[in-house]
From Swiss-Prot:
Subcellular location per the Swiss-Prot or TrEMBL entry: Cytoplasm
Described function: Catalyzes the condensation reaction of fatty acid synthesis by the addition to an acyl acceptor of two carbons from malonyl-ACP. Catalyzes the first condensation reaction which initiates fatty acid synthesis and may therefore play a role in governing the total rate of fatty acid production. Possesses both acetoacetyl-ACP synthase and acetyl transacylase activities. Its substrate specificity determines the biosynthesis of branched-chain and/or straight-chain of fatty acids.
Subunit structure: Homodimer.
Record flagged with keyword Cytoplasm: yes
Enzyme active site: C123, H256, N286
Enzyme class: transferase
Name of the protein this chain belongs to: Beta-ketoacyl-[acyl-carrier-protein] synthase III
Sequence segments annotated as region (ACP-binding): 257-261
InterPro entries: ACP_syn_III_C, ACP_syn_III_N, FabH, Thiolase-like
Superkingdom of the organism of origin: Bacteria
Encoding gene per record: fabH
Keyword Transferase recorded: yes
Amino acid sequence: MMEKAMKYAKIAGSGGYLPERVVTNDDLAAELATRQISTSDEWIVERTGIRQRHLAERGVTTSQLATEAARRAMDDAGVQADEIDMIIVATSTPDYVFPSTACLVQANLGAKGGAAFDVQAVCSGFVYAMTTADSFIRAGRARCALVIGAEVFSRILDWNDRGTCVLFGDGAGAVVLKAADEPGILAAHLHADGSQTKILCAAGNVAYGDVTGDPFLRMDGQAVFKQAVTVLDRSARDVCAEAGVEVDDIDWLIPHQANVRILNFLARKLRVPTERVVITVDQHANTSAASVPLALDVARRDGRVKPGQLVLMQGVGGGFTWGSVLARM
């Protein structure tokens, strides 16, 4: 009996979508001033590198952002809805308790019959989702997977908390992963430390028709910084070792776009020149699960990320969760 050929998951296309409303730091400072909260463009840029963010208008949902990003990724990959046999949406801000956002996207796209489900790992979500899709493709359980990171974090922010409300934006990014005979995703690592839940969480819930707990995002910024740079450094080295490459071999580092301080510190630890780090946090702010696919799409479309190059994508977020995906484009 002939042995079945090994299949790999390769990125065939990408797409991104940002809400039309752009809010600059000056815009945000003016809005917060009406609440007697003081901030400024200088204060925000110095601490985060963020200059603006896109915010969804009231009534715009995560599934709508995800659907538009998905359509753009499908166009880029040249695939039709009937070719998609798996949809995974990474989000912490779903439209509903259920059905899943992925099922809503599937209906919007006119895709039918394939698996559709959500993954919730906060800002690590896209890396978790892509690793999951990669496993299905390698196992022969899927051939064309749509992997989406989409968030409307503006709905869970406490706009009276200057330390968090300036950090986040809304958006969606997507990739199409297709089965291929040559390696695309070379290695992937996922991790979590559930003992660190309180450093970044939104601990609200809906029970018996009422919101219980605190529905807003809360973060210990210093603890998150310390954890993030430590685990991402180790994860990058581990995933490269598994793939048999050196960190120096990486053409592009695309980390979760939390803030520029984390990005720069991580680049220094890994000894990756900043010119080989894709940075979009200045324009998008922190879009949680959407940040990595959005950054990848920007870098592919502006010509920085090219076919054949080695790209390391990393996520880190609440849970505490983190992970890395190393891919040949």
